[in-house]
Amino acid sequence: MNHLFNEIVPFGQHLARVANGWDGHPGLIAFGCSLGALHAANLYLRRPDLFNGLLALSGIYTASYGFGSYMDEVVYRNSPVDYMANFPSDHPYIPLYNSQRAAICVGQGAWELPESTRQLKDIFERKGIHLWVDIWGHDVNHDWPWWYRQVEYFLPWLLGERAA
């Protein structure tokens, strides 16, 4: 994970600055679908100082899905439901989360598993973290056509082009 935070993210920021002629800090949004949603959420939740937003679609945010009751430090640090449940309510990242645009979305249709998204939503509410957690209907499946629609829906908001 340190390789991502210390090398890949700064390199991506450098490329964005060079390609666009920007000065300063270009915004990065952590984004992913399915397993990529877990990775995006994990990156953003662990280092919101490196990202300007999050869009996580149809993820499973608990390690118990793949590891059952097994837990060690590596598994814990990659299981947002577990580490966010223990996140201090006065952590300095909370104002940072609350000042950025971040959305986690899941459907309730075929192949979707919304329970860990609901768990994260409850944890965020208890901690005063105001991420947009959106649970779509029973017709929304774990599949590319729905993710395409969700990106179209959330992207203008993430870019500040419309209100939530």
Question: Where do the model's predicted regions map?
Answer:
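Non-catalytic cap/lid and distal C-terminal segments of serine-dependent acyl enzymes
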Residues: M1-A164
